[in-house]
Each structure stands twice: as C-alpha cells, then as structure tokens.
Amino acid sequence: MAKFEIIDTNTWIRKSQFDFFSTFLNPDYGFNKKIDVTTVLEYSKETKTSFFINFLYVFSLAMNDIPEMRLRYVNGEVRRYDLINPGYTVKTNDGSFNNCGHEFTRNYQEFYSRAHEQIEIHKEKVLTRENYNDNDRFLTMMVPICEGDSAILKPVFKTDIPISEFIKKFIPVKE
C-alpha cells in the first residue's frame, strides 16, 4: 500500500493555485523537451546495460526528489506520496505494445533488476489489468524521434535540462 500525507488545502501555501487549477476539466501537467543524454548513453555502452532502464532510473530519481511531482488529487483530497513509481510502454515481441511499470527504489541494482524483469514479462504478451494509472504512478513516454515542439506533443511546461543538470535536480521552466 502506497504511503502518503494528506495536505490540508485550507492552510496550504498553494491554496490559491489549487483553487484555480482544480476547476479545470483535466488539471494535469506534462512537459517534453530534448535532453542531453550523453552521460547516460556512455554509461550504458560502457556497462553494456539498457539505456532505457538507465535513463528511466535517472528520471525516476528526479521525479521522486521533487515533492510537487509526488502530489496527486484523489477522492477530493491532495496527497503527497512518499514515493511514486514509473509507468512506461514497451514493445511486445509480436510488434504490439504493452503498458508496464514497477515499484520505485533508489537502489540502482534493484531498480534495474525490477525494470528488466517487468520489461521481459510484458514483451511476451499483452497483459491487461483494471487500472494502469495508479495514484502513486507517473507515466512517461520517451520517444527519440520527437524533436522540438509539435501540435501533438504540446507541453504545459517547456524545459531545457541537460542530463548533468537533471541529475542535480534543476528544472528550469520557461515560457
């Protein structure tokens, strides 16, 4: 069971923003941007490990280190989860795709092992479940062919995050 803290929205420093955005039909956020992944790519080649899993680890660390990214609005209450888990899409062996994810851990070896195991399981066949959007999950899509802005992938937040800065947990937001 995921652990979380309930935020008292009446005394919350972000009450005015919460009141404003909670009136939106879909008050979610997202961002997309080219990221310099040279360091992760070099590490993956040197260690003969999966670039996808390695980048997912770095990204998951950043998502968990930013308290605002762990906020969720569930059943009329704002929750800050202790940890959030990555959700991602994998290509199946038959050419289809499958949604999968695993429990987050800061331990790299354990994270890598969990991700690798889930990817292998979900590559074999499409598994269905009742809910793919657990409250303690963040969904990620890493598409290497998307470049710049597009009408389809228009972000709410635009970020320029070189991987070296991303590891340091900076998220500059512009226009």
Where is each model-derived feature located?
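N-terminal beta-alpha "docking/capping" segments at the starts of catalytic domains
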Residues: 1-50
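A short, aromatic/hydrophobic, helix- or strand-capping loop or linear motif
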Residues: 68-75, 124-130
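Broad gene-expression machinery/nucleic-acid interaction feature
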Residues: 30, 83-87, 138, 152
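Acyl-group handling in specialized metabolite and lipid biosynthesis
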Residues: 31, 40-47, 95-110, 156-157
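Catalytic micro-motifs at enzyme active sites that drive phosphoryl/nucleotidyl and oxygen chemistry
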Residues: 18-20, 75-78, 151
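Helical lid/core segments from catalytic subdomains that handle acyl or acyl-like groups
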Residues: 92-149
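Small-residue-rich loop/turn and linker elements
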Residues: 69-101
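Acyl activation and transfer enzymes in specialized metabolism, enriched
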Residues: 40-65, 155-171, 175
